[in-house]
Amino acid sequence: MTWRERFIDFFGLQKSIVALLFMAIFVGLGEKMAERFLPIYLLALGGGILSVGFLNGMDNLLSALYSFPGGYLSDRLGYKRALVVFNLVAMTGYLIVILFPHWLAVIIGAAFFLSWSALSLPATMTLVSRSLPLGKRTMGVSIHSLVRRIPMALGPVIGGVLIGLYGEKTGVRLAFVAAFLLGVVSLVLQQAMIEDDHKRGNAEKKPSRLWRFMSQDLRNLLVSDILIRFAEQI
């Protein structure tokens, strides 16, 4: 086994996983480059402080609500098709913000692309679990979490540069144009590199029924996670 093969095997860099990592970079870069400056953009468009507060509240709410449809569509369509749908939804929101420079249009568009990470997380974790053997799944999740930090660091810097060069209104709109184009690149990579998911079609419509399928350890983890996040927000 060559050093390249050992490297690929150690980090679990299967073809679908590599595509997922590129998607995390491209979509995440567009998301962080534009989304972080939405409050500034709202104020520049005359939305006022209340619109900024509403945007932040909507972001927290959608982060919770989007998780279930994200999981349902991932089970129903398969992770590959679900990721395509999620990207198209986000790109629709980007287009609304680009084409209609009004604070109300920004709020409407934001409903499509806010909390993309929460919406896509179930499909992402399903892809990792089905693409990698049991002994490499933790490594796959770790690499994905690490790579996601790259756009988190670079996105706001690039967005800030655009605002500095072109002003608050034009700079933010250009950031959304870049986010849309990066979404297109991500779609192309998904179709070319991610393998089809053949285990799809069965999806539970009622979240309450999922509780009885959980092991005791998973139930304990869920309860502890809820309590920790509640304490974190206090």
Predicted regions mapped to residue ranges:
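Residue-level signature of mid-helix packing/kink "hotspots" within the transmembrane helices
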Residues: 60-68, 152-153
